[in-house]
Amino acid sequence: MFGRNKIRSKQDHVILLVDDDKGQLDVFATWMAAVRPDVHVRAAATVEEAINLINAHTFSLIISDYSIPHAGAGLNIFEAAVQSGIPKSNFIMLSGTTDNLPDEVRLVSKGDLVALETAIQQALV
């Protein structure tokens, strides 16, 4: 009740990455291990899987594709994250488009690793 039963990793920071493209998940996990070896990365390939993980675990940061599998589905993950208590600033949406995104969603263009690394560092301070 009230998140007390959520599982916390032994690492200081746990990041959830959500993308329906397995190749993107693999590339991100490899990149993250090189850039931030102090974090533990969990991955989800569907909206349902992501929401189940959000309900069962505590995450420091959630990074989600906007179009998983269709445009806007990432907003369902954003809503679940906010309901779980994660600050809106600790949610990053990856997208090639900015259409229909609420102002409170932090957007990083897919493939812009410099901007993504900056956003991750700001969220994990």
What are these model-derived regions, one by one?
Residues 1-16, 99-125:
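Non-catalytic signal-transmission and effector/linker regions of two-component phosphorelay proteins
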Residues 14, 40, 58-60, 90:
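Structural signature of beta-strand start/N-cap positions in the alpha/beta core
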Residues 18-20:
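Conserved acidic carboxylate
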Residues 22, 45-49, 114:
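Acidic phosphotransfer microenvironment of two-component signaling modules
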Residues 22-42:
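Two-component/phosphorelay signaling modules centered on CheY-like receiver
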Residues 29, 43-61, 69:
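Acidic, metal-coordinating helix/loop segments flanking the phosphotransfer/catalytic sites
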Residues 63-82:
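Conserved phosphotransfer microenvironments
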Residues 78-100, 108-109:
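A short, hydrophobic beta-strand element within the central beta-sheet of small alpha/beta folds
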